[in-house]
Amino acid sequence: RELFDGETLVVRIPTWPRKQGGAKNLILNYLVFVLAGMFCLPWALRGLKFDAILVYAPSPITQTIPAILLKWIKRAPLALWVQDLWPESLQATGFVRNQKALSAVGYMVYWIYKGCDLLLAQSKAFIAPLNDYANRSKIRYQPNSFPDQSTDALVDAPAPLLATLESKFCVVFAGNLGQVQALDCVVDAAELLKDHRDISIVLVGSGSKSEWLAQQKLERGLGNLELPGRFSMQTMPSIFNRAGALLVSLEDDPIFELTIPSKIQAYLAAGKPVLASLNGEGAQVVLEAKAGLASPAGDSAALAANILKIKAMAIEERAEMGRQGKSYFLEYFETESQARHLAETLSAMGKGTQ
């Protein structure tokens, strides 16, 4: 037990660590959390009353099962904030390929959704898939948010990175460097642009593709591909502020057309032009906000063309894209306003007036 911000009680339960990954550790992590939650939480929360229960649910969806038990014990309504679609995401990532297993997961998802009083969709495109497993009347749109960091204290990036950011037109990608980020497309775009010596693509972060990226940079002689590593959240604004544009990319898969990558909110908050190399809802947000340019997922030639196009724009034109994106962010994604909306939704659910 601990207090968050000195006033909010946080109760932690044991689970199996993921360690170095692998299917065995992942399955044990999922299973042990469910069992520990069902046995530990009712005891740890004994004597406490709740107006509502909220589950924030990136994978796995099974984390909702202990909350369903708590709902029955505490007689409090349960809201599930869906961040990832099951079984679709299991199939898209290749984690589960057997159709019978996917069907069984589908039945489990139906049961979990049935046990919830309210389903919150992080993307408008989630609503239709959720409706396949639950009644439309209990589905609401609740986007993810990001804090407005314009007044936060900044920490400068290391000098070598700052020198690159200030001497070239830099397209910055920030976040996990993994399989689903379609980094092969980004590397191919860098190769197409390597004769443009005043352009650099900067991939800030780390992940399962970090070693592969370093190898590709060396083998292809990509002096325009920068891999500076990870930095603290306090450092990111100084990097974003010096970027010519910010890049978000995802693989070409139907499941990813439904989601809005969380980095889009962060990019809009930064007030810089956004280059979206993806399909579906994420690209739609960038275009609707008039905050940047979009190209089809996996199309390296189109991405390279958009990089050249945005670089060729007048500085004021790029600045206007940034302003439009920031305005859209403040209206739809800013943390304080979205937190108020979520609190109002949960309050109404607790009073039975949702």
Where are these regions (language model features)?
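Carbohydrate-associated surface elements
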Residues: 125, 142-145
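Nucleotide-activated donor-binding/catalytic signature segment of Leloir-type glycosyltransferases, i.e.
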Residues: 202-205, 211-238
